[in-house]
Curated annotation (Swiss-Prot):
Alphabetically ordered keywords of this record: ATP-binding, Cell inner membrane, Cell membrane, Cytoplasm, Membrane, Metal-binding, Nucleotide-binding, Protein transport, Translocase, Translocation, Transport, Zinc
Chain residue ranges for the region called Disordered: 879-909
Intrachain S-S bonds: none
Assigned EC number: 7.4.2.8
Family: Belongs to the SecA family.
Annotated Gene Ontology cellular component terms: cell envelope Sec protein transport complex; cytosol; plasma membrane
Organism classification: Bacteria, Pseudomonadati, Pseudomonadota, Betaproteobacteria, Rhodocyclales
Known role: Part of the Sec protein translocase complex. Interacts with the SecYEG preprotein conducting channel. Has a central role in coupling the hydrolysis of ATP to the transfer of proteins into and across the cell membrane, serving both as a receptor for the preprotein-SecB complex and as an ATP-driven molecular motor driving the stepwise translocation of polypeptide chains across the membrane.
Compartment(s) where it occurs, according to its Swiss-Prot or TrEMBL record: Cell inner membrane; Cytoplasm
Name of the molecule in the record: Protein translocase subunit SecA
Species of provenance: Azoarcus sp. (strain BH72)
Annotated membrane topology: Peripheral membrane protein
Cofactor note: May bind 1 zinc ion per subunit.
Gene transcribed to yield this protein: secA
GO biological process, one term: intracellular protein transmembrane transport
Length: 909
């Protein structure tokens, strides 16, 4: 009561904001005569003047009134369109990083030019994001004329474009494109191997059109790039033949006294690893030459043969460490992993690093190619990375809380330019679907008879086509519009306002194109204007005739009541229903809307079916009669609010899971960018190498252990096999009784540095540094992809922890952190091992080794929203994604450990 009284006295926050913006509108209007007096050249020169003022210390807010006045004048000169005062307010709302809710037909496309122009002046780029390629192309072409007139460049980012075209589009001052394409480009930019391959140049300011569709409906559906690595089926099969030909060494690892029978490889059960002996290296090379996998005289550790080493070790591990009916079972022609702790089958899980395929080759079952997720991100996390984010839509107010809670975006409802006079009728509720459809057909027939255009909204393509069949039976001409986007869609929608035209559309189809009463005349006018064979005087005469004919048709439609909207079912979200209603009543036009429902509709069944059915039976309502009361409409809207709240809770919970992986991706992508931008990463490689040798040493010689507990023989063998460091450790220990563990460690690290320096001395230093960087990038990418799969598996089952009285979110956070620690350790070990063992003999070999791996069958997915929501409700988990600001070296690590970033997950670099 008190809050209501205060609102009456001072107005709502929305009212107060509109009043504040109106002060600037008065300033812009005052500048109009002065700006209108400028020549075209002087008006264009304003852009350079604004940029100079910015360089001299002015802010964008200082420039706003004059910049908006300049854009308004450019709109008048280029398109004959003058921004209304309410459109100026919309532009200010966008500039302030808020959401502008503007009714359909209020000119949102034109509003975007104001904020886009102002924010493009600093030269950091502006992205204007729409829901499909058609709208992006249309808006870039139309609004690009205004920007071009003022000396700014416009780009259009479409899915079919090549790499060079995309770079050009992003280099423009203002870039139009679809949400999918901007997201995929971001992911692709984080998969490149050279900075020059990137297309985006930073995420500065985005204006999102249809912001509710993109930031709410699609916010939880990840964009996924997946692909198959090269098919190595033949290699797995051949290595499966090689493995049994190599002999396992019996007895100790390399202590000559404890070796019972020398062999080609040793098995370290403690480390779950297989290591080739010196004899094994030679024998393996001979066998590989014999079967044609290795050229005569080539070494196993040359750059071009690294893949052979990887597959050979996978085959040896499959034969020596993994046993049928203990570690796995063969079921229905597939290798299924057995959980070592519970003994349960883990269907769907696969070992990484080619091990699973090696086991499949061993068992003679079909070798399945790995289809990996290469990268993924949700729109929610992508858009939160922009320095400033703004949006426009006709229906945001119902979701204002979510926009504010998730994105920190405030929604401002912009007043209409003319009062809205559309009449929204109460819902009509029938007992059966048959009665409902009969009433819908009767209403449509009545409108056609009176010459009133009708737009019928359906919730699915199936219903769309069912109603089309009923209209065909009733011999009522109509046009069908499905959500499958095609270029003729805009043309169908544009003519949906002609007298007696019936259009059936799925609720989301055709957004972005206005339904003008009497039909859209702009296309025929443009055709006449562009016809060079017609003299100028005749052109004007034809255009005048077209406009006069349109005026008569327009008045005829207004007399019939304007556009009539029929909804055939309530959607789960009030916002979607409001979008359908909002197609009518644009710019103060008359119009009407009504929803026809039945107790057999899904939403009615869930929330109100039984109660209303009982009322209808009690009132003995005859067939074909409907309940029509405001109470029923309010009851349905209350049910919709409950569903919206449930969906919001799901999205919010999924975000909490997302943020865990989000922080990890932030670290990985930052490491990747630092690698790309650093020419010489030798210091990083050195720190990693020394760290890995230290960790290996402590595996065999634990801290604070006595000499009897040392496994010097195992350490000697591991150094020789994994790092080609052949050091007489046993002899050192025997010859020098006072040699302590720290002294041994120092000698090992010094020997590693010496061996590495000798390797670099053989080749050009710059080429070697490039090779180091590519090895690092490839390892990081490979293990990050495996990590994404591991997180996905973890997430799928984490909700079961609740049955053990554990908090699933906390468990997920803890285990995801452990997986990430393992990822970083694995990258360090792999890179160090490869660089220590690779044998470079010529510059050509180095160039060959630098080439990044090719991914085959790369696919781009964006999951269906309803599928994703259903899956989310079942598992309360989602695909991890990346976002957030850059982490400084001395900032707290985002993993939550409490350490500085450089001492925690930043230690990789």
């Amino acid at each position: 009561m008190i809050s209501g009284l205060l609102k009456k006295l001072f107005g709502s926050r929305n009212d107060r904001l509109i009043r504040q913006y109106s002060q600037n509108v008065r300033k812009i209007n005052a500048l109009e005569p002065e700006i209108a007096a400028l020549s075209d050249e002087a008006l264009r020169g304003k852009t350079g003047e604004f940029r100079q003022r910015l360089a001299d210390g002015a802010t964008l807010n200082d420039l706003l009134p004059e910049a908006f006045a300049v854009v308004r004048e450019a709109g008048k000169r280029v398109h004959g369109m003058r921004h209304f005062d309410v459109q100026l307010i919309g532009g200010m709302v966008l500039h302030d990083g808020k959401i502008a809710e503007m009714r359909t037909g209020e000119g949102k496309t034109l509003v975007a030019t104001l904020a886009a122009y102002l924010n493009a002046l600093p030269g950091k780029g502006v992205h204007v994001i729409t829901v499909n390629d058609y709208l992006a192309s249309r808006d870039a072409e139309m609004m690009g004329r205004i920007y071009g007139f003022l000396g700014l460049t416009t780009g259009c980012n479409l899915s079919r474009m090549g790499h060079a075209e995309k770079q050009l589009a992003y280099a423009a001052d203002i870039t139009y494109g679809t949400n999918n394409e901007f997201g995929f480009d971001y992911l692709r930019d984080n998969m490149v191997y050279a900075t020059g391959e990137r297309v985006q140049r930073g995420l500065n300011f985005a204006v999102v059109d249809e912001v509710d569709s993109i930031l709410i409906d699609e916010a939880r559906t990840p964009l996924i790039i997946s692909g198959q690595a090269e098919d190595h089926t033949d290699l797995y099969l051949k290595m499966n033949q090689v493995a049994p030909l190599l002999k396992r060494q019996e007895g100790g690892l390399d202590d000559k006294d404890s070796v019972i029978e020398p062999g080609d490889y040793t098995v370290d059960l403690k480390a779950h690893q297989v290591l080739l002996t010196e004899q094994g290296h030679e024998n393996a090379e001979q066998i590989l030459v014999r079967i044609g996998l290795l050229p005569e005289g080539a070494g196993l550790y040359e750059p071009g043969n690294i893949l052979l080493v990887h597959h050979l070790y996978a085959a040896l591990r499959a034969h020596a460490l993994y046993h049928k009916d203990q570690h796995y079972v063969v079921q229905n022609g597939e290798v299924v992993i057995v959980d070592e702790f519970t003994g349960r089958l883990m269907a769907g899980r696969r070992w990484s690093d080619g091990l699973h395929q090696a086991v499949e080759a061993k068992e003679g079952v079909r070798i399945q190619a790995e289809n990996q997720t290469l990268a993924s991100i949700t729109f929610q996390n992508y858009f939160r990375m922009y320095g400033k984010l703004a949006g426009m839509t006709g229906t945001a107010d119902t979701e204002a809380f979510e926009f504010h809670h998730i994105y920190g975006l405030e929604t401002v409802v912009i007043p209409t330019n003319r009062p809205m006079v559309r009449k929204d009728e109460n819902d009509k509720v029938y007992r059966t679907a048959k009665e409902k459809w009969e009433a819908v057909i009767a209403d449509i027939a009545d409108c056609v008879k009176r010459g009133q255009p009708v737009l019928v909204g359906t919730t699915s393509i199936e219903t769309n086509e069912y109603l089309s069949g009923l209209l065909n039976k009733a011999k009522i001409a109509h046009q069908l519009l499905n959500a499958k986007q095609h270029d003729s869609e805009a043309q169908i929608v544009a003519q949906a306002g002609r007298p007696g035209v019936v259009t059936i559309a799925t609720n989301m189809a055709g957004r972005g194109t206005d339904i003008v009463l009497g039909g859209n005349i702009e296309k025929p006018v443009s055709q006449v204007r562009d016809d060079d064979s017609v003299p100028a005087a005749e052109k004007e005469s034809r255009i005048a005739a077209l406009r006069e004919e349109w005026r008569k048709v327009h008045e005829q439609v207004i007399a019939a009541g304007g556009l009539h909207i029929i909804g055939t079912e309530r959607h789960e979200s009030r916002r979607i229903d409001n979008q359908l209603r909002g197609r009518s009543g644009r710019q103060g036009d008359p119009g009407s809307s009504r929803f026809y429902l039945s107790l057999e509709d899904p939403l009615m069944k869930i929330f109100a079916g039984e109660r209303l059915n009982a009322i209808m039976v009690r009132l003995k309502m005859p067939e074909g009669e409907a309940i029509e009361h405001g109470m029923v409409t309010r009851s349905l809207e209350s049910a919709q609010r409950k569903v919206e709240q449930r969906n919001f809770d799901i999205r919010k919970q999924l975000l909490e899971y997302d943020d865990v992986a989000n922080d990890q991706r932030k670290v990985i992508y930052q490491q990747r960018n630092e690698l790309l931008e650093t020419e010489d990463i030798s210091e990083t490689i050195q720190a990693m190498r020394q760290g890995v040798l230290h960790d290996l040493f402590r595996t065999y010689v634990p801290v604070d252990s006595v000499e009897d507990q040392w496994d010097i023989a195992g350490l000697e063998q591991a150094l020789a096999s994994d790092y080609l460091l052949k050091l007489p450790l046993l002899e050192w220990v025997k010859a020098e009784p006072n040699l302590d563990d720290e002294a041994i460690l120092k000698r090992i690290i010094d020997a590693g540095e010496e061996a590495y320096a000798a390797k670099i001395a053989q080749v050009d230093a710059a080429a070697w540094h490039q090779f180091e960087r590519n090895v690092m990038l490839q390892s990081l990418d490979t293990h990050w992809r495996e990590h994404l799969a591991a997180l996905d598996h973890l997430r799928q089952g984490i909700h079961l922890r609740g049955y053990a009285q554990k908090n699933p979110k906390q468990e997920y956070k803890r285990e995801a952190f452990e997986l990430f620690e393992t990822l970083l350790d694995t990258v360090r070990a792999d890179v160090s091992k490869l660089l220590m063992t690779v044998q470079i003999r010529t510059e050509a070999q180095l160039d060959e080794a630098e080439a990044p791996p090719e991914m085959e069958n790369v696919q781009y997915h964006h999951a269906d929203y309803d599928e994703a929501l259903a899956a989310a409700a079942a598992s309360t988990a989602e695909t991890p994604v990346q976002g957030g600001p850059k982490v400084g070296r001395n900032d707290p690590c985002p993993c939550g450990s409490g350490k500085k970033y450089k001492h925690c997950h930043g230690k990789l670099s």
